Amino acid sequence: MSHRKYEAPRHGSLAFLPRKRAARHRGKVKSFPKDDPKKPVHLTASMGYKAGMTTVVRDLDRPGAKMHKKEIVEAVTIIETPPLVAVGVVGYIETPRGLRSLTTVWAEHLSDEVKRRFYKNWYKSKKKAFTKYAKKHAEENGASITRELERIKKYCTVVRVLAHTQIRKTPLKQKKAHLMEIQVNGGSVADKVDFARNLFEKPIEIDSIFEKDEMIDVIAVTKGHGFQGVTSRWGTKKLPRKTHKGLRKVACIGAWHPSHVQWTVARAGQMGYHHRTSCNHKVFRIGKGSDEGNASTDFDISKKQITPMGGFVRYGEVKNDYIMVKGSVPGVKKRVMTLRKTLYPQTSRRATEKVELKWIDTSSKFGHGAFQTPEEKRAFMGTLKKDLVTSA
């Protein structure tokens, strides 16, 4: 008769308790990179929308490794990043209890997609948000606005830019833009405030924040799975086949005393839709939406865009700038992703390696052939009946 061990490592991590639904849909930056006044003034984060995944082929550049200068295949995630629009600046002062916002200065003109963020029901509202505030920019040549900016320069130590996405440029049906604070690092406080003021109502391109071969962090809310049992939620072992009243359970949930179930015991409940930060994703490429060959390489010179044949499944076409990062990131397609510069200087060979892509797969992600472009498919298949019907 077989026997089992009486002790085993626990199943599942207790590091992410409580496993409950995230309070906010957008990933929140809880820590920004440390400020260095010696560096030039720059932004430290951005936002984008997850489009999907694809495959790339490249030569590994890692001297000493067995695969050095050999082709490897890697999975990448495409995140569509239309330019952000800066609409405000916030100044923070340091107190014994942490940072406290001193004042917020808003731009004169705000688009409707960000104004929707301030209303529960945009359709029934009077849409009067910021009409009174906008007059401050005209009164006395914006003296009150200048006064608030000077207060930030005088008292604050941390400066953050308020920026929102241009969600209307994506295939999403949602009309309400996502708004976030992006910390400004580098230079003096006065330099930071002037930098933020000059960004008002201007687009912020993704390549002005991140660059190729950089390591970044992706903050998002994971895919939700609803109420799940203990086996799938915690990875506990299934009980033997002849077990009474169910197999996918925990056989013993605790001792007689203490006479309650301890918090460390694996239980059924909410799985997924958790706030997570995925660290150290290498940027393989930053593509421009205006470039007709933004998925072409020196090895594959065919003119093709990053959108695969038939579009990204459950997303559509990527018509704007995009960022390609190595591996998978949290969240489902269409979900907003918060992209942040890494918190620590990266020194590993993987981080410092220069990546040169040889080929990017743009075939259908729905299983209809391996054709990379419509022209390639037409050349192979010839004239089809549906083409004749369409032309007629």
UniProtKB/Swiss-Prot annotation:
Q: What is this protein called?
A: Large ribosomal subunit protein uL3
Which InterPro entries does UniProt cross-reference here? L3_arc_euk (IPR045077), Ribosomal_L3_dom_3_arc_sf (IPR044892), Ribosomal_uL3 (IPR000597), Ribosomal_uL3_CS (IPR019926), Transl_B-barrel_sf (IPR009000)
Keyword Transport carried by entry: no
Q: Which GO terms describe its biological process?
A: translation
Q: Where in the cell is it found?
A: Cytoplasm
Q: What does this protein do?
A: The L3 protein is a component of the large subunit of cytoplasmic ribosomes.
GO CC terms of this entry: cytosolic large ribosomal subunit
- Tell whether Ribosomal protein is among the UniProt keywords: yes
> Coiled-coil segments, which residues?
none
What's in the keyword line of the UniProt record? Allergen, Cytoplasm, Ribonucleoprotein, Ribosomal protein
Encoding gene, per UniProt annotation: rpl3
